[in-house]
Amino acid sequence: MANNTITVQLTRSPIGRLPKHRETVKGLGLRKVGQTRELEDTPSVRGMVNKVYYMVKVVGE
């Protein structure tokens, strides 16, 4: 089984957003706008990305 990863970038600030959404961004390991993280491609990570779709962008899969 291949080690699948996705690259996620924070495109908008979590300031002024719902507290649950801010915690989700923090859970993805994103702090600053423009920061990217390479994460495992799991259903839980995909769900977190879908929850804050308006603040993050999937750069690479």
Swiss-Prot record:
The keyword Oxidoreductase does not apply. GO terms for biological process: translation. PROSITE patterns: RIBOSOMAL_L30 (PS00634). InterPro entries: Ribo_uL30_ferredoxin-like_sf, Ribosomal_uL30_bac-type, Ribosomal_uL30_CS, Ribosomal_uL30_ferredoxin-like. Belongs to the universal ribosomal protein uL30 family. CDD domains: Ribosomal_L30. One of its GO terms (cellular component) is cytosolic large ribosomal subunit. This is Large ribosomal subunit protein uL30. Keywords: Ribonucleoprotein, Ribosomal protein. Part of the 50S ribosomal subunit. Pfam families: Ribosomal_L30. GO terms for molecular function: structural constituent of ribosome.
